[in-house]
């Protein structure tokens, strides 16, 4: 059986005998060593998780390039992508897999899998907020963080105005990436910078790559981790 076939046709976790899965283990470890070297070298043993619909102990999946927002408005989705572009980021809200080092957080979206990029990858994260939508959109403090990144002229225009994202004028100012100061944005949004810090922070990490390898978190801990 070819590796791809094996990865796509593994057993359900509740039916697998981990102690008798040596063949699968050897093939998964070999696949990681042959195809995931950039991540292994950059992460230095750290892992991130993604919550996905269960599909076996290990499988590969193409990363979507056309993701649409589910938890936020299209305007905020486009704003976040625009801010990422300001700092030269490649991984954004449209073309990335969303990951976290907090397994429990990943489990709110599905079964927890260790996510490992196959081949080259890019990533974006923020040291200032853990969840972009929750921390920037759902409360007044988040709105203040956005205002703080505006360029001087736009910020002055709003200085004496009650900032209300439901007010048409202030909302249009806030959602336009052209109104932001790139140097200020770069303090809060890191593109391809400090991956180990990103993982250690437990914050949301967007990873852009062609393909992602997913490994059941229990199988990874019990069998795979000590070999990679």
Regions picked out by a protein language model, each given a short descriptive name:
Residues 1-7:
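Enriched but not universal
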Residues 11-22, 36, 117-228:
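Active-site and NAD+-binding cores of ADP-ribose-processing enzymes
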Residues 28-41, 99-104, 191-194, 201:
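Intrinsically disordered, low-complexity boundary segments flanking structured domains
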Residues 44-46, 57, 81-156:
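ADP-ribosyltransferase catalytic core
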């Amino acid at each position: 059986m070819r590796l791809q076939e094996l990865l796509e046709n593994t057993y359900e976790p509740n039916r697998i005998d981990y102690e008798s899965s040596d063949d699968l283990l050897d093939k998964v470890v070999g696949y990681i060593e042959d195809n995931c070297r950039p991540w292994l070298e950059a992460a230095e043993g750290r892992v991130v998780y993604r919550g996905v619909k269960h599909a076996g102990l290990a499988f590969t999946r193409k990363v979507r390039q056309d993701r649409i927002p589910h938890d936020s408005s299209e305007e905020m989705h486009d704003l976040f992508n625009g801010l990422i572009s300001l700092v030269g980021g490649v991984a954004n809200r449209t073309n990335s897999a969303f990951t976290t080092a907090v397994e429990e957080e990943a489990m709110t979206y599905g079964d927890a899998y260790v996510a490992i990029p196959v081949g080259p990858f890019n990533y974006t994260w923020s040291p200032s907020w853990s969840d972009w939508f929750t921390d920037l959109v759902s409360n007044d403090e988040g709105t203040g963080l956005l205002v703080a990144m505006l360029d001087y002229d736009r910020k002055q225009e709003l200085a004496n105005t009650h900032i209300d994202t439901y007010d048409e004028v202030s909302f249009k100012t806030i959602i336009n990436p052209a109104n932001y100061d790139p140097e200020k944005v770069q303090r809060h949004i890191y593109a391809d910078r400090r991956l180990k810090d990103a993982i250690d922070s437990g914050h949301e990490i967007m990873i852009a790559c062609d393909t992602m390898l997913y490994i059941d978190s229990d199988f990874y801990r019990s069998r795979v981790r000590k070999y990679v």
